[in-house]
Design a protein with these regions (language model features):
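Flexible loop/turn segments at secondary-structure boundaries
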Residues: 44, 48-49, 83-86, 100, ...
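Glycine-rich, histidine-containing beta strand-loop boundary motifs that form or position
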Residues: 39, 111-112, 154-158, 223, ...
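Active-site neighborhood of glycoside hydrolase catalytic domains
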Residues: 130-137, 141, 147, 169-329, ...
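Carbohydrate-binding surface patches
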Residues: 383-411
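N-terminal accessory beta-strand-rich subdomains and adjacent acidic, glycine-rich linkers
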Residues: 1-59, 65, 376-379, 411
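Hydrophobic beta-strand core residues of beta-sandwich domains
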Residues: 29, 132-135, 402
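Aromatic-lined carbohydrate-binding/catalytic grooves of carbohydrate-active enzymes
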Residues: 70-204, 214, 218, 235
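Contiguous C-terminal substrate-recognition/catalytic subdomains in enzyme active sites
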Residues: 339-388
């Protein structure tokens, strides 16, 4: 819990680790036991907001896991946003792969749905390919992606299991969050408990199989439930179980990166949730939103470096089938100073609009070396969704890059 306020003419900041009031957390320490609270960092300055965030940006880079992804800032194409919407098929992927490669993308990620013939929400957990969607297997698609010079990726949600997944009926209750003797579920899914070594072994087996069978080098790791206050199984309190699970998950993640140091895993949670540096000190890239209107997305893009480093901030750019030249430009500028998550039906755009996408990606490749060393600035302040003008800047030692947007208005 943290709060900032003004009381009796004094500004105060209160920050604490888990507690019973705010986190349903209680832990009984026996003689000789120890407990380490969650870490916190505070940036103080008399030079204004930009300076405070710049200092925090540098700090975030220091505590982050060293990795090649945040040095190279490669461009990702993902087939979800304003494109396949979680219903991929082999026939639809091939033209997208061709168009993404032609535009200059370097990763190609198959998003949700590759593992189910139809509706899949409450049945996830097996992570086996759908032969209906991919008659010759997902490997045919990932091989084609590599033949086009890109690294293949897939979508996963490895912290949950659907209530109708056959595995959920076969494994014991201690695989899942429990409260009051019953499994915790939300939106027809159970929350897996990573304190359980069998759960971590299951998760390892999925990662190992996807890398071995499909040759993936990128995983979009999503999370779309709300598990509530935690689990009281083998814990002094629900919050104690929650924090212990979270720390076990982070240890599991560290072990994955130790086995596969070149693997890129994106942190995603219903768009841009769970954007904290417990996660982002491990993950190299973070989904920021599933906002599907590019005119609103510029506000999210412009403000995102206040919460994470620019090179970790993944921004969707999705030219529309029915759009025009200015719509493409607006879309591409959304992502130009951050991490490009290209999407949209690129193969169906006019040649002029496809050329604009390629031009933007070519320019991005010339400036991304500066993004990883820059700090954000906001010349006209943080953006709000109703603002006519929005601006984000990145400042390096000898350069300033500016992204400027105008939406609506008559100027």
């Amino acid at each position: 819990h943290w709060e900032i306020g003004d009381q009796n003419g004094h500004l105060y900041l209160a920050a604490s680790g888990p507690n019973e009031i705010y986190s349903h957390w209680f832990k009984n320490l026996k003689p000789g036991d120890t407990f380490t609270s969650v870490p916190v960092a505070v940036s103080l300055t008399d030079q204004g907001f930009d300076d405070a965030v710049g200092t925090m940006t540098k700090y975030r880079r220091i505590i982050r896991r060293p990795n090649a992804d945040n040095e190279s800032l490669k461009i990702i194409f993902n087939d979800y946003m304003n494109c396949l919407w979680g219903h991929p098929t082999a026939a639809e992927e091939f033209p997208l792969i061709d168009a993404a490669a032609e535009a200059g993308c370097e990763y190609f990620c198959i998003d949700a749905g590759w593992y189910a013939d139809g509706d899949w929400w409450d049945a996830v957990g097996d992570w086996r390919e759908s032969k209906k969607r991919f008659p010759n297997g997902v490997r045919e698609i990932t091989d084609y992606i590599r033949s086009k010079g890109m690294i293949p990726g897939v979508w996963l949600e490895l912290e949950v299991m659907g209530i109708n997944c056959h595995m959920a009926q076969e494994v014991p209750d201690d695989w899942f969050f429990m409260r009051h003797g019953k499994r915790v579920y939300d939106r027809s899914r159970y929350q897996l408990d990573y304190r359980n070594l069998e759960v971590r072994a299951y998760a390892d087996s999925v990662i190992d199989r996807l890398i071995k069978e499909y040759g993936v080098g990128y995983i979009k790791m999503d999370y779309n439930i709300e598990p509530g206050i935690g689990t009281d199984l083998h814990a002094d309190s629900a919050g104690d179980g929650m924090l212990s699970h979270e720390r076990a998950y982070l240890k599991w993640l560290e072990a994955v990166f130790k086995r596969y140091p070149d693997l890129v895993i994106e942190n995603c949670s219903s768009g841009g949730l769970r954007m904290d540096y417990a996660m982002l000190s491990r993950y190299s890239i973070q989904s920021t939103s599933d906002q599907d209107d590019y005119r609103y997305y510029c506000t999210i893009a412009a403000n995102s470096p206040s919460a994470l480093t620019p090179e970790q901030s993944a921004i969707w750019s999705y030219p529309l089938r029915e759009g025009d030249r200015e719509e493409v430009v607006f879309n591409m500028v959304n992502a130009m100073l951050l991490r490009i998550h290209q999407s949209g039906h690129l193969a169906e755009l006019t040649q002029e609009r496809r050329d604009l996408v390629k031009e933007a990606l070519d320019i991005y490749k010339t400036i991304r070396k500066d993004i990883k060393n820059s700090v954000p600035i906001w010349p006209i302040g943080l953006s709000q969704f109703h603002d006519e003008w929005t601006c984000l800047g990145l400042q390096s030692e000898n350069k300033i890059y500016l992204a400027v947007w105008r939406r609506n208005g008559n100027k």
